[in-house]
């Protein structure tokens, strides 16, 4: 019989892609990437003094915040400005309507994080 899905080949391609990426990063590249994600997430957290952090402990590259207004409205406002601000936790059954999960990667610069923080501030107070 012919398979109805190509999930196995998709998994193999994803694994191959991950392997190539890790090889290109080199011996210390994964550690450097992880450190960059961590430090940039901590930097962004320090810029978000107008929201409540839902976890005061250390995080890696994601953290949850409670916004002063509903997350869906803030997300819509920021998407209109070209940002993908995060995931509303309520949609995942993990929080209230004002809770947002934000992720930061090594690809974002501090300048980009500053622009995002200011846009988020404006969206929260519109």
Language-model segments: which ranges?
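Flexible loop/turn segments at secondary-structure boundaries
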Residues: 27-31, 40-42, 62-63, 71-72, ...
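Hydrophobic side chains in well-ordered alpha-helices
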Residues: 33, 44, 74-77, 112, ...
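Hydrophobic alpha-helix feature that most strongly marks membrane-spanning transmembrane helices
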Residues: 23-26, 38, 42, 49, ...
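Conserved PLP cofactor-binding pocket of PLP-dependent enzymes
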Residues: 56-58, 81-101
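PLP-dependent enzyme catalytic core of the Aspartate aminotransferase-like
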Residues: 91-126
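Conserved PLP-binding catalytic core of the aspartate aminotransferase-like
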Residues: 51-81
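Active-site C-terminal subdomain of aminotransferase-like
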Residues: 1-48, 53-56, 60
